[in-house]
């Protein structure tokens, strides 16, 4: 849903990116650090939200979404509220969304800083992460009792890692191939919008007056050869291969750590042994909203990264089993 709040956020992010590009040409990495410092000073002026305020803002946003739906079908629904009243709810919703976003911009910076070797400037990662934050605010369901910071981290990380995966080409194509690739991409987008699926090479070729073999060749040439073992995070734990989409992965709402209401999750984790419970809480930021790396958790418990990974995997399976046995999963 396109909103004025989103537009303002994208506009602000674009201005930051444009300024960064200009200054980088003259000051390089030092200028980037200066811009990040200025940005942090600016966003630090907005206070953080407590859980009650998050719920209040979410309710206001939800009311605005409903009001927009009513307003769009105003003549058919015969709504009791006037157009002016509905528009007032929409405007208030946009203001609430803007406050929600601004109050969590520091979370985006914290996540973006985990990828210093991604090949992208920190400001660019922050800009992509901000888009993920906007998505999180729009999708957040306060009724499930989750901490917003934990929920939003998933969306922020998704936006950033996808940006890393789409980073600048390592192989430069000739201009005529770039133009041909652009035409192919345009047909792909239009076909997908019209038919709801990706076109086959033969369907693209028919539209462009080309051959399926030529379309396949151009798409193959356009692929970037990137090492799957390339490290992209500060601790060296995340490799490029880890960023590739898992088509079998569940959405954040379906995850075992977000499906359950917070009080039920606390109850389930309390059934694990103390060490395992502590590891799960640290890994997923359940107590303070800050997710720890395998290395950090390992140091805290005097265990290796691999051992922490094994304990975490076993614990998640145990939590799923407990959720089924207790009926929490069905109630979520």
From Swiss-Prot:
Membrane spanning residue stretches: none
Biased composition (Basic residues): 1-11
CDD domains: Sigma70_r4
Comp. bias regions, Low complexity: 13-22
Motif (Polymerase core binding): 124-137
UniProt xrefs under InterPro entries: RNA_pol_sigma-70_dom, RNA_pol_sigma70, RNA_pol_sigma70_r1_2, RNA_pol_sigma70_r2, RNA_pol_sigma70_r3, RNA_pol_sigma70_r4, RNA_pol_sigma_r2, RNA_pol_sigma_r3/r4-like
Alphabetical UniProt keywords: DNA-binding, Sigma factor, Transcription, Transcription regulation
GO MF entries: DNA binding; sigma factor activity
Biological-process GO terms, alphabetical: DNA-templated transcription initiation
UniProt cross-references to Gene3D superfamilies, sorted A to Z: RNA Polymerase Primary Sigma Factor, Winged helix-like DNA-binding domain superfamily/Winged helix DNA-binding domain
Pfam families xrefs: Sigma70_r1_2 (PF00140), Sigma70_r2 (PF04542), Sigma70_r3 (PF04539), Sigma70_r4 (PF04545)
Region (Disordered): 1-25
DNA-binding region: 294-313
Superkingdom of the source species: Bacteria
Subunit structure: Interacts transiently with the RNA polymerase catalytic core.
Role noted for this protein: Sigma factors are initiation factors that promote the attachment of RNA polymerase to specific initiation sites and are then released.
Family to which the UniProt record says this protein belongs: Belongs to the sigma-70 factor family.
Name recorded for this polypeptide: RNA polymerase principal sigma factor HrdD
């Amino acid at each position: 849903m396109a909103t004025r709040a989103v537009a303002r956020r994208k506009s602000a992010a674009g201005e930051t990116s444009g300024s960064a590009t200009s200054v980088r040409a003259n000051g390089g990495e030092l200028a980037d650090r200066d811009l990040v410092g200025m940005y942090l000073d600016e966003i630090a002026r907005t206070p953080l939200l407590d859980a009650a305020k998050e719920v209040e803002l979410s309710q206001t946003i939800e009311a605005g979404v409903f009001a927009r739906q009513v307003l769009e079908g105003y003549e058919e629904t015969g709504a009791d509220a006037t157009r002016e009243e509905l528009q007032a709810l929409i405007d208030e919703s946009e203001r609430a969304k803007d406050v929600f976003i601004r109050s969590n911009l520091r979370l985006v910076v914290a996540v973006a800083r985990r990828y210093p070797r991604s090949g992208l400037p920190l400001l660019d990662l922050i800009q992509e992460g901000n888009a993920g934050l906007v998505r999180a605010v729009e999708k957040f369901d306060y009724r499930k009792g989750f901490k917003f910071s934990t929920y939003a981290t998933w969306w922020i990380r998704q936006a950033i890692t996808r940006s890393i995966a789409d980073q600048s080409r390592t192989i430069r194509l000739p201009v005529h191939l770039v133009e041909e690739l652009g035409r192919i991409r345009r047909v792909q987008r239009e076909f997908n919008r019209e038919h709801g699926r990706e076109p086959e090479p033969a369907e693209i070729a028919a539209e462009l007056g080309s051959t399926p073999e030529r379309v396949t060749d151009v798409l193959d040439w356009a692929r970037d050869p990137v090492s799957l073992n390339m490290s992209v995070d500060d601790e060296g734990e995340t490799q490029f291969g880890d960023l590739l989409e898992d088509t079998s992965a569940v959405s954040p709402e379906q995850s075992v750590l977000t499906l359950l209401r917070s009080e039920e999750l606390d109850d389930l984790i309390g059934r694990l042994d103390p060490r395992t419970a502590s590891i799960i809480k640290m890994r997923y930021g359940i107590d303070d909203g800050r997710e720890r790396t395998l290395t950090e958790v390992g140091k805290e418990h005097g265990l290796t990264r691999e051992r922490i990974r094994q304990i975490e995997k076993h614990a998640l399976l145990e939590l799923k089993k407990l959720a089924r046995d207790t009926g929490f999963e069905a109630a979520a």
